[in-house]
Amino acid sequence: MGCNSYMPQGSAGGMLLLLLAFCLLGDAGCALSPPAASPALPTAHLPLSPRKGSNSSTAAGAPLATVPSATSPNKPRTQRALVVLVLVSAAVIIYFVIRTMRTRRKNKKTRKYGVLDTNLGNMELTPLEQDDEDDDTLFDANQSRR
């Protein structure tokens, strides 16, 4: 079996741990691999200042400042971190929804005594037959059919 063989099948906690381990190993793999040689980043040229003695603000041949474009080398890493964050958040939400649904289902099965769902106006309470004469009286709830 895989690395999650010690966890019960279908365990949301196990799935979260497996996802976390995958993310950590994925980041370590990227950190260990040498960075690939990327082509020179495209740059946008903006005028630094107008030439002395020139009336126009954008003179041809003016010294230009280079500004890196919107694409940065950290964009894939940031995008990957965002995807991991969204996936982990979705897994946590799904875990809590499933856990809530399971506890509600168990409560319906195990609840023997509680508030009756029927209208109390239609109930007829009669004492149960007992040999003891105690202060506690138990009543049998029967719906009267009128």
UniProtKB/Swiss-Prot annotation:
**Cytoplasmic compartment residues:** 102-146
Q: How does it sit in the membrane?
A: Single-pass type I membrane protein
User: What are the disulphide bonds in this sequence?
Assistant: none
Question: What is its subcellular localisation?
Answer: Membrane
- Give glycosylation sites per the record: N55
Tagged with keyword Mitochondrion:
no
Q: Which residues lie on this side of the membrane: Extracellular?
A: 31-80
Q: Where is the signal peptide?
A: 1-30
Q: Which UniProt keywords apply?
A: Glycoprotein, Membrane, Signal, Transmembrane, Transmembrane helix
What are its GO cellular component terms? membrane
Q: Where is the composition biased (Acidic residues)?
A: 129-138
For the region Disordered, give the residue spans. 43-75, 125-146
Q: Where are the transmembrane segments?
A: 81-101
Family the entry assigns: Belongs to the FAM174 family.
Q: What is this protein called?
A: Membrane protein FAM174
